[in-house]
Amino acid sequence: MFYPDQFDVIIIGGGHAGTEAAMAAARMGRQTLLLTHNIDTLGQMSCNPAIGGIGKGHLVKEIDALGGLMAKATDLAGIQFRILNASKGPAVRATRAQADRVLYRLAVRTALENQPNLMIFQQPVEDLIVENDRVVGAVTQMGLKFRAKAVVLTVGTFLDGKIHIGLENYSGGRAGDPPSISLSQRLRELPLRVNRLKTGTPPRIDARTIDFSQLTPQLGDTPIPVFSFLGNAEQHPEQMACHITYTNEKTHEVIRNNLDRSPMYAGIIEGIGPRYCPSIEDKVMRFADRNSHQIFLEPEGLTSNEIYPNGISTSLPFDVQMQIVRSMKGLENARIIRPGYAIEYDFFDPRDLKPTLESKYIQGLFFAGQINGTTGYEEAAAQGLLAGLNAGRFANEEDGWSPRRDEAYLGVLVDDLSTLGTKEPYRMFTSRAEYRLMLREDNADLRLTETGRKLGLVDDIRWAHFSQKVEQIEKERQRLRDIWVHPHSENVSEINALLKAPLSKEANGEELLRRPEIDYRLLTSLTSFGPALTDPQSADQVEIQVKYEGYITRQQEEIEKQLRNENTLLPVDLDYQQVSGLSNEVIAKLNDHKPSSIGQASRISGITPAAISILLVWLKKQGLLRRSA
């Protein structure tokens, strides 16, 4: 052909999932094609101008630890950085950044265009080429056929997307973009379960029409945090403040008086919306006892006058949106630049996926992002990286890889989706992870970078930085273990000055650091224990590892017990009707979910410990009891 049409991996869609998938496959050396309906919207932040948050920031750090793009792009585009839960334990601390939309998109596009093995082509995809239950390519709107060994679908909200503003609606993938109708129809012909979900976005406000003098500013942290393990604060652009306002009784009255004009309450929208990011009309009705709700006014960029009012996502008519906005303090004369809206779209049941995000029914077809029922840039990007990695491995006839629940929030995310499925847009929280003390933001690289290197995702620069950090931490911990003081040491007085009670017996540096009144900075400021590490990441890691060592050891013991079940594999084609002793309900659920391991089966709602015992005995009798390495 006069144009390249043979690839290892094709990625369909250029949002947060698609861009990470494309970068991952290409980093592994696979010839990769990224098909997008518009090159100018690669990495577009379709909703809020922010990255990270509780649970979400953990995913971003994991993406970064595996060589991904999101954290690096955020460091180049972030205009305000904060550590959430900074006063709490390290397991729930999370980084969040406001991002300049234009700079973020530029950072993503620049990375894609400079990635070897990756070709970008602008054309909507209308069909998949499927032969003998295996995907072998894609067909674009103009009839171009591209063939590949694996295909990754990362189409966001575009599949048969329908936008709602009041009682009016029209087809669209998001505001200003067409939907993907033909591809939606094609996917519905495949043996995959499909349903509808809904999400929404608030109106955007002209900053020049806001009276900021009436509002409370919210500043970023000092010193300014960074997202990437390779990042530094010097990469950040100019920093900006957010501002806070509140809804009030007048706001709520406007909403209650116009519920008959809401497509949700009028029954026009059938898709279920996100529980943890509800529309303002939902909040007012669900929390009727609340007199006000906090609204964050977030700048969309350094060169933009648009403000994103985080907390008033709505699909009410435009005139009602104007009343809502102008009912709030500081916004009395505000002007809306873009109306808020809700969007309904197709998603496919993630229980039809393997933990690698490959379809159980169409070989070589991978799904990532909102098509799997998730919500959020971070959740999409994490899935994209995993799907791109596994598409690359599939194309090279290698076994797939997926992290366990005790290894990564990405493991929790994929296990929740592929085991339990979802009936509403799924978002990540730290509370979803049972081993969250092990899954901290600060140790994402220690958990995943070595694996990423083996998988071909981590380049030489990141590997050298990581190796140096590991060596620093190990040497510093050994140094502290080797320094001893006793009650009659020459410098004991400066140590006693920091302690609640004078030193009564000999102790080394690590034992002193375990005391609640001592932190690493204080300890290394003492003559006997200095100098401190200059790298703040390594210094933090030393303190956390020492102070939480007992808790971490106990959690590791719990994990090792659970791994026995996780590593006990179940045959993919097992018909559970054959297993005598299981109830009809358990048989139906196991046949429906098709779990890949005993551990996964045990997390399905309604699968009892007794059922697991019966299953284990049956597997042993049949000679099918196998454990993964």
UniProtKB/Swiss-Prot annotation:
The keyword NAD applies. One of its GO terms (biological process) is tRNA wobble uridine modification. Its cofactor is FAD. Keywords: Cytoplasm, FAD, Flavoprotein, NAD, tRNA processing. Its main location: cytoplasm. It comes from the Bacteria. SMART domains: GIDA_assoc_3. It is found in: Cytoplasm. One of its GO terms (molecular function) is flavin adenine dinucleotide binding. NAD(+) binds at residues 273-287. One of its GO terms (cellular component) is cytosol. FAD binds at G13, G14, G15, H16, A17, G18, V125, S180, Q370. It holds the Pfam family GIDA. NAD-binding protein involved in the addition of a carboxymethylaminomethyl (cmnm) group at the wobble position (U34) of certain tRNAs, forming tRNA-cmnm(5)s(2)U34. NCBIfam families: mnmG_gidA. Belongs to the MnmG family. Homodimer. Heterotetramer of two MnmE and two MnmG subunits. HAMAP family: MnmG_GidA (MF_00129). This is tRNA uridine 5-carboxymethylaminomethyl modification enzyme MnmG. It comes from Yersinia pestis. The gene is mnmG.
